[in-house]
Amino acid sequence: TVYVDSLMKNLNLKSVGHNIGDNFKVKNISVNLTPADHAYQNAYPGMSKRWFKNEDACGFWFDTPDGTIWATGDSRLMPEHLTMKAPDAILFDFSDSEWHFTFEGAVKIANAYPDALLLLCHWGSVDSPEFSPFNGDPKKLYDVVVNPERIKVLAPGEPFVLQRSKR
């Protein structure tokens, strides 16, 4: 984002900022910035000296020769998250954090894209089950997600081969 670009430049690092909706290419992969709402700092006075805006955070939509992947980013649920073109796979955060989708919001996203593979993320990599951003339990998804066979529980570093959906 433009905000992250400013932080990089403050460190004298070469970078390019992008706005939500911008598209850029990395070789044969097209990348689009998707909206996110993760300005949690604004809810806690004194946490930061600046006011954060929604466009400071983002998700990423990757269009690859093998298919599309939506990396949602850390975000609260936004209406536009439910009306995007269907991806082939979603890096799927299903924790119960109010600054993420919440469990119920994550289920809404999963069921809005009933053919997208759900690559579970943002859980199990931090031993902190009492801390809501990391408290996801994959077993809870199977009874509430349409087409639960698309839920993919991968170990860290486990390969995943993306294939374009036949829909």
Regions found by a protein language model. Give the residues of each.
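Active-site metal-binding motif and surrounding structural segment of the metallo-beta-lactamase
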Residues: 1-17, 85-91
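Active-site environment of divalent metal-dependent phosphoester hydrolases
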Residues: 2-7, 22-25, 39-41, 76-80, ...
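Alpha-helix C-terminal capping segments
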Residues: 7-11, 62, 81-85, 141-148
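Binuclear metal-ion centers of metallo-dependent hydrolases, dominated by the metallo-beta-lactamase
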Residues: 15-22, 107, 111-167
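Core dinuclear metal-dependent hydrolase active-site scaffold
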Residues: 17-84, 155-167
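Metallo-beta-lactamase
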Residues: 58-107, 112-116, 120-129
